[in-house]
Swiss-Prot record:
Binding site for (2S)-2-hydroxy-3-oxobutyl phosphate: A85, T86, R127
Source organism superkingdom: Bacteria
Pathways involved: Cofactor biosynthesis; riboflavin biosynthesis; riboflavin from 2-hydroxy-3-oxobutyl phosphate and 5-amino-6-(D-ribitylamino)uracil: step 1/2
Organism: Agathobacter rectalis (strain ATCC 33656 / DSM 3377 / JCM 17463 / KCTC 5835 / VPI 0990) (Eubacterium rectale)
Family: Belongs to the DMRL synthase family.
Biological classification of the source: Bacteria, Bacillati, Bacillota, Clostridia, Lachnospirales
Broad enzyme group: transferase
Name listed for the protein in its UniProt record: 6,7-dimethyl-8-ribityllumazine synthase
Gene Ontology cellular component list: cytosol; riboflavin synthase complex
Gene designation: ribH
A GO biological process held by the record: riboflavin biosynthetic process
Amino acid sequence: MNVIEGKMTQDGIKVGIVVARFNEFITSKLLGGAKDGLVRHDVPEENIDVAWVPGAFEIPLIAKKMAKSRKYDAIICLGAVIRGATSHYDYVCNEVSKGIASVSLESEIPVMFGVVTTENIEQAIERAGTKAGNKGYDCALGAIEMINLVRQIG
């Protein structure tokens, strides 16, 4: 049996990050975690491009534009959607997750889902660097692993 695994090494990779400005007190921490994860694994800062969008709903379009440019080996999508009193939360979560998934499948470029979807602000804070780790950092490691896995498969 031949096992193919993505390694936590990189060789000249370039990563695009799309981050939502809405709930910026959370998303800026996710972005910090993503950049930290990439730099700690030897991705030079000049190989990391960051695009800010108004909110999570706008993430898939810019992720798709980045993917179509073919400049990036992976794209990391970061946002924070926190449930409120209306059904808006459900619509945004559904469309953002579908949109991000479609970008990855259509482009065949790893697109990491770092949009935290939580019931309350406390859960979002936990996922942005406290009790539950930092989902941005997790996405950075996942991006490096997926880049190497995709390269191995060809």
